[in-house]
Structures are given as C-alpha cells and as structure tokens.
A protein has these predicted regions:
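Acidic, metal-coordinating catalytic segment for phosphate/diphosphate chemistry
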Residues: 1-34, 40
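A residue-level structural signature of the nucleotidyltransferase/glycosyltransferase Rossmann-like core
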Residues: 5, 43-44, 135-136
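Nudix hydrolase/Nudix homology domain
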Residues: 21, 58, 96-101, 108-175
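Conserved Nudix-box catalytic region and its N-terminal flanking loop in Nudix hydrolases
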Residues: 22-33, 40-80
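A structural signal for short, well-ordered beta-strand segments
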Residues: 35, 64, 94, 115-117
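Short alpha-helical functional segments enriched in proximate histidine and acidic residues
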Residues: 85
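A short coil-to-beta-strand element that immediately follows conserved catalytic motifs
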Residues: 89-97
Length: 175
C-alpha cells in the first residue's frame, strides 16, 4: 500500500493527496508531525532511523515523526506512530506548529507544515526494527552540543525542529 500525504497550503488547508515519495521528490508542502518524549530527568528520547529507510537512514532524530492520514487528527497520528515505531503509549499534547523546508541532498526535499507534539514518560521504548535501529535519552544541552559537533549524524529536519523545540521548552517547561 502506497502511503499518501496530505498536501496543504501555507494556512494548513488541505489541497490534495499525493504518494509520499512523490511529494518528497517534488518538494511539495504537506502536513506532518514530530513527537518529543521527555522523561522526569528532563532528557529527550531520540531514535536512530533504521538503515533500511529510503531517506536519512541511520541518522538520529526526535522520538518519532511522520505524516497524518486523511481523516486523522494530529494527536491520533502522533499516538499511532509512537506506538508503531517505539512501542510506547503516552498521552500527547500539541504545543506549536511551523513550516520548514529541508533539502536532503539526494533529490528529496522535506517541505512540511509540522505539528510538534510532546509527551512525558520514563518508559523505555520497545523499538520496531523496520523503523528504528537504536534509541537513547539525552538532555537538551547534550543534543545541542552533539548537533554542533557532528551535524551529519542528525536528520536535516531534526536540526531545524530541535532549535525551535529547545527554545520552547526553555520558555515553557519546568523540569
């Protein structure tokens, strides 16, 4: 089954559906979400993408991210993928959204209207090896330092999203 993404305008109004790979090849704006799980120590759960992924294999990124299905709201989509990728069931809250564009250097471009979702858990994930090859907890400061020192180890979108998320948690969350 081909996975379709929801094409949107800059106001997040749906304008059509397209196969995911084609949307990434054409760099068309589509709806997406990014989940961040934080533990009681203030650490963020990161995943290393499976080596079999068609883009950004083996790179580190946020807890999980994907695309909403037609008729699915952001929180439903986030919970679905958090379970499918990380084997976790965690209440999520939508905290902000923004548009970004990130060429991935292989003829593909992420151009997303991204909803950032947050959840809190001390649970260890039970990863799906088709999606994820490794995971770790890291403080925001450790992540920021690692991105600065080894940016090639992180997905293009995570580097953009993390900067916004870092400022959000610094201003809004007491850990």
């Amino acid at each position: 089954m081909e996975e379709k993404v929801i094409l949107v305008d800059e106001n997040d109004q749906p304008i059509g559906l397209m196969e995911k790979l084609e949307a990434h090849q054409k760099g068309l704006l589509h709806r997406a979400f990014s989940v961040f799980i934080i533990n009681s120590k203030g650490e963020i759960l990161l995943q290393q993408r499976a080596l079999s992924k068609y883009h950004s294999p083996g790179l580190w990124t946020n807890t999980c991210c994907s695309h909403q299905r037609q008729g699915e709201d952001n929180l439903q989509a986030g919970k679905r993928r958090l379970w499918e990728e990380m084997g976790m069931q965690v209440p999520l809250k939508q905290v902000f959204s923004f548009i970004y564009e990130a060429p991935m250097g292989n003829g593909l471009t992420e151009h997303e209207y991204d909803y950032v979702l947050i959840g809190f858990s001390d649970e260890s994930p039970s990863i799906n090896p088709l999606e994820v090859c490794n995971w770790k907890w890291a403080t925001p400061e450790q992540i920021q330092k690692s991105i600065a020192e080894t940016p090639e180890e992180y997905t293009a979108w995570f580097k953009i999203i993390f900067d916004k998320f870092y400022h959000f948690i610094a201003e809004n969350i007491t850990l």
